[in-house]
Swiss-Prot record:
Record's protein name: Probable ubiquitin carboxyl-terminal hydrolase creB
Catalytic residue positions: 64 (nucleophile), 419 (proton acceptor)
Catalytic activity: Thiol-dependent hydrolysis of ester, thioester, amide, peptide and isopeptide bonds formed by the C-terminal Gly of ubiquitin (a 76-residue protein attached to proteins as an intracellular targeting signal)
Region described as Disordered: spans on this chain: 1-45, 113-146, 242-269, 496-761
EC main group: hydrolase
C-alpha cells in the first residue's frame, strides 16, 4: 500500500511544470475599439483645417480648467483659423520636423507587458516565505473615467508641443504656445490622440504668478486672462513692425484669402480679429431724476457675467442684467447738469453684439455669514439657440441669432475644489465630451443634464454661443429628423434570428400558395366590408394576436400568392413603429387618458356640487315649511286654549252675559232705528228663531270639539268643517234683518231673557 502511494505521488509530481520552464508568450491582441473610434469609422480623408481631429489633453494636476477652455477655443472655427494664420502659417517642413520629434506612438504590447510584469511580481511575492500574501485587489471598473483615461494614455498617440515661435518670426509668449498646440493638432496625421500642453503651462506659470501653484483655478478667470493676453501679444508684435511695412497692403495669397473668409474680418488690420470675434459693446444709460438728462457711457466686454436666480433661464438672467437700477442714498449719481449728487436710474444695454458670445453664469457667490464664496445650485435653463433682445435702438444687427456650441461644466461643491469638463458640438460628428485625456461621443440631450437640478454636483458654468442663420438652423433640424427616421427604419427592418444572423422580414413571406381542401370550398364565406379609408390600427403581423378580429364564418384562408418583389423598393408602405414612436404614442395615450380622467373628475365634482346645492335648497324649503306649520299650530293652540279657558271660567253665564250685552246693544240700536222706521208694520218673531240666534250651549260645543279634532293645516281664519260659511255682506244683511225683527217693543227682549233662564234651569 505504501509503495502504491509513493508511486502515485511520483507520477503526480512528474506532471507538474518545472520551475525553470518559460511559459508560452501570449499573442498581442489589439485593445477594444472606443466609442469615438466607432464613430469615426466612416470618416473620409484627413482634412487640412483640423476639424476632424479629436485630441484629449493630459492633466498635470488640477489643470482641467486649462484643458476645457483650450478645447472650446480650438473648436471655435474662426478663432482657430485666426490663430493659425497669424502672422503666417508655419512652413510645412518645420512643422513636420517638429511633429517628428514631439509625436510619439505608443507600443501596442505595452499593456500586455505591464500585465505580465504585474503577474511576475505577484508570483515572486507569493514564493517568498517571509512575505505576507497580497490582499485581494478589487478589479478595475472598465466603465470609470479613470480607467478610460489610463487606457487612453497607454494606447493613443501622445503629442508633446514644443516652442516653434522662431519659425514664424515671433518671440515666445502665451499666444505662440497656443498657436503651437493648434498647429500640432492640425498637422498631425492621426485623428485621435492626447496632447501634452506642458510647454503652454510653463509659459503661463512664468508670466502669471497666480497659476504657479497646484491649487484649483477658475475656468472663467483663465478664459478672460487668455483672451486679454492674446490681444496684448498680438498688438505688441504688430507694434514692433516698421510703420512703412504696416501701411503697405499685404499680398493676397491663398492663406490670406482663407483667413479673410474664415474670420470674416471687416477691417484690414489683422490685429483686430480677437476684438471682432469676442468683443462686444455695452452702453450704460443713466437718467437723472431731477433734470431728466440722459448720459451714456460705452464699455467693451469679452464675456458677459450674469447673476442667477432659482428656476430661471438665460433669457431671464439677461433681462435682469438690463433691468433698471435705482441710484439713491449712498449710490447717488453725480449729474454734470445739476452739479451735484442726484437720484438717478441706470440700466445696461448691448450696443454691438459679438460674433462669439461667452456667457459666464455666476455660480459662486460671496456670503456674509460664511465669509467665503459658496456655489449656487440654481436651475438655469439654457437654450440651443438664443436671440438677444436687450439691445439699443441703434445697435448693429440686433436680430442676430446664436447657437450653442460649447459648455464648460464645473463638478464640485465649491469654488476651491472640483473638476472641469467640456461638452462641444463639432462640425459633422455631433456632441463630444472632453474630460482631460478621455473623449467620448454623447447625445444632444446630454447637454440638458447640467441645468443645475440634476442629482450630483455638475452645473454649467460657461456657455459659448456662436452666430448662425435661420437657414442653417432649419437645415440642421431637417438633417436631424432624417437621421432619426433612417435609424428607426434600419432598426425595424433588420430582425435578428435566434442564432444572431440578420434576416430581412421579406424572407418570412411564403412564396407558394396552399391548395384549399374540399371542406374549405364547401364552407360559406362571410361578407366582408371593403374599406374605403386606411386603417388606423397596427398591422396584425406587428400587433397583438389577441386583438386580431376572427369571424367564425371566414375560413382559415390560405396564404395568397405573393406578387414578385421588385429589385428596388422605393418606399415602405406601412413602416413598422419603432420603440421611440411607440413610447411617444403610449405617452400621448396616457396623457389623453389623464386629461379625460381629469375632465370626468371635474364633471363629477360639479355634479356633486349641484346636487348638494339642490339638497341644501330643499332642506331650507322644508325647514321653512315646518316652521310655518309649527307657528300656525301654536297660534291655533293658543286661540283654542284661550277660548276654552274663558268658557271654563264663565260657563253658560258668560254666554248669557255676552248674549245680554249683545241684546241690550241691539236694543239700543232698535231705539235709534225706531224713530227712522216707525211707520213699518210690526213683524212677529217666532220662538224657535230666538233660540237659534242665541247659538249652541257650551256642552254642545265641547261635544263637537271632542268629536271633530282640530285641523292644524288650516289657517286660523279658515272656516271650520261642519259650520256654514257666511260672507260679510250676508252677515250685514242678516244683522239688519234681525234688528228689524227685534226693533218693536220691549216685551221681546224680556221674553228672550225669560226663555234663556228657563233653558239654564
Amino acid at each position: 500500500m505504501g509503495s502504491f502511494l509513493r508511486s502515485f505521488r511520483h507520477n503526480g509530481g512528474s506532471t507538474a511544470p518545472s520551475v525553470g520552464a518559460v511559459p508560452a508568450k501570449k499573442e498581442p491582441q489589439p485593445p477594444p475599439m472606443t466609442p469615438l473610434e466607432k464613430r469615426l469609422l466612416d470618416m473620409g480623408p484627413i482634412r487640412e483645417d483640423g476639424s476632424d481631429k479629436f485630441y484629449g489633453m493630459e492633466n498635470y494636476g488640477n489643470t482641467c480648467y486649462c484643458n476645457s477652455i483650450l478645447q472650446c477655443l480650438y473648436y471655435s472655427v474662426p478663432f482657430r483659423e485666426a490663430v493659425i494664420n497669424y502672422p503666417t502659417r508655419t512652413p510645412i517642413e518645420s512643422l513636420e520636423a517638429a511633429l517628428a520629434k514631439s509625436l510619439r506612438y505608443p507600443n501596442p504590447n505595452a499593456q500586455l507587458e505591464a500585465e505580465a510584469q504585474a503577474e511576475k511580481q505577484k508570483a515572486a511575492n507569493a514564493q517568498r516565505p517571509g512575505m505576507p500574501p497580497n490582499p485581494q485587489q478589487k478589479p478595475e471598473d472598465k466603465d470609470s473615467p479613470e480607467y478610460k483615461k489610463k487606457m487612453a494614455l497607454q494606447t493613443l498617440p501622445l503629442l508633446e508641443t514644443q516652442n516653434n515661435a522662431a519659425s514664424y518670426g515671433m518671440s515666445e509668449s502665451l499666444f505662440t504656445s497656443l498657436k503651437d498646440i493648434f498647429e500640432s493638432v492640425v498637422g498631425s496625421q492621426s485623428r485621435i490622440g492626447i496632447i501634452r500642453p506642458q510647454q503652454f503651462l510653463e509659459v503661463l506659470r512664468r508670466d502669471h504668478e497666480m497659476f504657479r501653484t497646484a491649487m484649483h483655478q477658475d475656468a472663467h478667470e483663465f478664459l478672460n486672462l487668455l483672451l486679454n493676453e492674446v490681444v496684448a501679444n498680438v498688438e505688441a508684435e504688430a507694434s514692433k513692425q516698421p510703420l512703412m511695412e504696416k501701411s503697405l497692403p499685404a499680398p493676397e495669397t491663398a492663406d490670406s484669402v482663407d483667413q479673410s473668409s474664415s474670420t470674416g474680418s471687416k477691417t484690414p488690420n489683422t490685429t483686430r480679429w480677437v476684438h471682432e470675434l469676442f468683443e462686444g459693446l455695452l452702453t450704460s444709460e443713466t437718467q437723472c431724476l431731477t433734470c431728466e438728462k440722459v448720459s451714456q457711457r460705452d464699455e467693451v466686454f469679452l464675456d458677459l457675467s450674469v447673476d442667477l436666480e432659482q428656476h430661471s433661464s438665460v433669457t431671464s438672467c439677461l433681462r435682469k442684467f438690463s433691468a433698471e437700477e435705482m441710484l439713491c442714498e449712498r449710490n447717488k449719481f453725480h449729474c454734470d447738469n445739476c452739479g451735484g449728487l442726484q437720484e438717478a436710474e441706470k440700466r445696461m444695454k448691448i450696443k454691438r453684439l459679438p460674433r462669439i458670445l461667452a456667457l459666464h453664469l455666476k455660480r459662486f457667490k460671496y456670503t456674509e455669514d460664511l465669509q467665503r464664496l459658496q456655489k449656487l445650485f440654481h436651475r438655469v435653463v439654457y437654450p440651443y439657440h438664443l436671440r438677444l433682445f436687450n439691445t439699443t435702438d441703434d445697435a448693429e444687427d440686433p436680430d442676430r441669432l446664436y447657437e450653442l456650441y460649447a459648455v464648460v461644466v464645473h463638478i464640485g461643491g465649491g469654488p476651491y475644489h472640483g473638476h472641469y469638463v467640456a461638452i462641444i458640438k463639432t462640425e459633422d460628428r455631433g456632441w463630444l465630451l472632453f474630460d482631460d485625456e478621455m473623449v467620448e461621443p454623447v447625445d444632444k440631450n446630454y447637454v440638458k443634464n447640467f441645468f443645475g437640478d440634476k442629482p450630483g454636483l455638475a452645473c454649467a458654468y460657461v456657455l459659448f454661443y456662436q452666430e448662425t442663420t435661420l437657414e442653417a438652423v432649419l437645415k440642421e433640424q431637417e438633417q436631424e429628423n432624417m437621421d432619426s427616421n433612417l435609424a428607426a427604419t434600419d432598426a425595424n427592418d433588420t430582425i435578428l434570428k435566434q442564432n444572431g444572423f440578420p434576416q430581412s422580414p421579406l424572407a418570412h413571406v411564403h412564396s407558394a400558395s396552399q391548395i384549399p381542401s374540399h371542406e374549405d370550398n364547401l364552407r360559406p364565406n362571410g361578407l366582408r366590408r371593403a374599406p374605403t379609408a386606411p386603417q388606423l390600427s397596427t398591422h396584425h403581423e406587428h400587433g397583438d394576436p389577441e386583438s386580431t378580429p376572427f369571424s367564425p364564418l371566414s375560413p382559415l384562408s390560405p396564404v395568397p400568392p405573393v406578387p414578385p418583389i421588385p429589385e428596388r423598393v422605393a418606399t415602405v408602405a406601412t413602416p413598422p413603429k419603432n420603440d421611440a414612436l411607440a413610447k411617444r404614442e403610449e405617452k400621448e395615450r396616457k396623457a389623453a387618458e389623464k386629461e379625460k380622467e381629469k375632465a370626468e373628475k371635474l364633471r363629477r365634482k360639479e355634479q356633486g356640487a349641484r346636487m348638494k346645492e339642490n339638497q341644501r335648497r330643499e332642506e331650507a324649503e322644508l325647514k321653512a315649511a315646518l316652521e310655518m306649520s309649527k307657528a300656525s299650530k301654536a297660534e291655533e293652540d293658543r286661540r283654542l286654549s284661550t277660548e276654552n279657558g274663558k268658557e271654563k271660567q264663565g260657563g253658560g253665564l258668560s254666554r248669557l252675559k255676552r248674549g245680554s250685552k249683545s241684546l241690550s246693544h241691539r236694543l239700543g240700536k232698535d231705539k235709534e232705528t225706531r224713530s227712522v222706521s216707525s211707520d213699518l208694520p210690526p213683524v212677529p218673531i217666532p220662538e224657535h228663531s230666538t233660540l237659534s240666534q242665541s247659538g249652541p250651549t257650551s256642552e254642545q260645543q265641547q261635544q263637537q270639539r271632542q268629536q271633530s279634532p282640530p285641523n292644524h293645516d288650516q289657517p286660523p281664519n279658515s272656516p271650520q268643517p261642519g259650520k256654514p260659511t257666511i260672507r260679510e255682506d250676508e252677515q250685514v244683511n242678516h244683522k239688519d234683518s234681525k234688528h228689524e225683527r227685534t226693533g218693536h217693543g220691549k216685551w221681546r227682549s224680556f221674553s228672550l231673557r225669560k226663555k234663556s233662564f228657563s233653558i239654564l234651569s
